[in-house]
Amino acid sequence: MSFSGVKVSPECLEAFQELKLGKSLRYVVFKMNDTKTEIVVEKKSTDKDFDTFLGDLPEKDCRYAIYDFEFNLGEGVRNKIIFISWSPDVAPIKSKMVYSSSKDTLRRAFTGIGTDIQATDFSEVAYETVLEKVTRK
């Protein structure tokens, strides 16, 4: 449980394991339930198109997401699981506060994340920006 009292639903952990071990999912988007007491799965997808994933992040509200990021730098195809904390500048203040104070609870539940990204704008989660972050040494 987080400082905010928010819990992580068991389906979040199941979805993470499905993405990490099953390799059937490409990404999962998480949100707060309506009462802001639990983090739940909003969407699971097998779509490999990064722009489709970005389209599932709302322009005006917060979300968390995990993405199995695939890239090739000439050494063969590699994958890294990234955790994204999405908090757009135009999101409601209360939403930003709850998501911010609950992020670590969800993040700690996931072992095997390669890169964490905190984003307030789509430019911070653009493919090239993410590629740069996951390939930093």
UniProtKB/Swiss-Prot annotation:
Keyword Cell cycle: yes
Localisation per UniProt entry: Cytoplasm; Cytoplasm, Cytoskeleton; Nucleus matrix
One function term, GO molecular function aspect: actin filament debranching activity
GO biological process entries: actin filament depolymerization; actin filament severing; mitotic actomyosin contractile ring assembly
Keyword annotations: Actin-binding, Cell cycle, Cell division, Cytoplasm, Cytoskeleton, Nucleus
InterPro entries: ADF-H (IPR002108), ADF-H/Gelsolin-like_dom_sf (IPR029006), ADF/Cofilin (IPR017904)
Superkingdom per UniProt: Eukaryota
GO cellular component, one term: nuclear matrix
UniProt-listed CDD domains: ADF_cofilin_like
Major subcellular site: cytoplasm
Ranges of residues in domain ADF-H: 5-135
Pfam families referenced in this protein's UniProt entry, alphabetically: Cofilin_ADF
Family: Belongs to the actin-binding proteins ADF family.
Summary of the function given for this chain in its UniProt record: Controls reversibly actin polymerization and depolymerization in a pH-sensitive manner. It has the ability to bind G- and F-actin in a 1:1 ratio of cofilin to actin. Binding to F-actin is regulated by tropomyosin. It is the major component of intranuclear and cytoplasmic actin rods. Required for accumulation of actin at the cell division site via depolymerizing actin at the cell ends. In association with myosin II has a role in the assembly of the contractile ring via severing actin filaments. Involved in the maintenance of the contractile ring once formed.
Protein name: Cofilin
Gene from which the chain derives: cof1
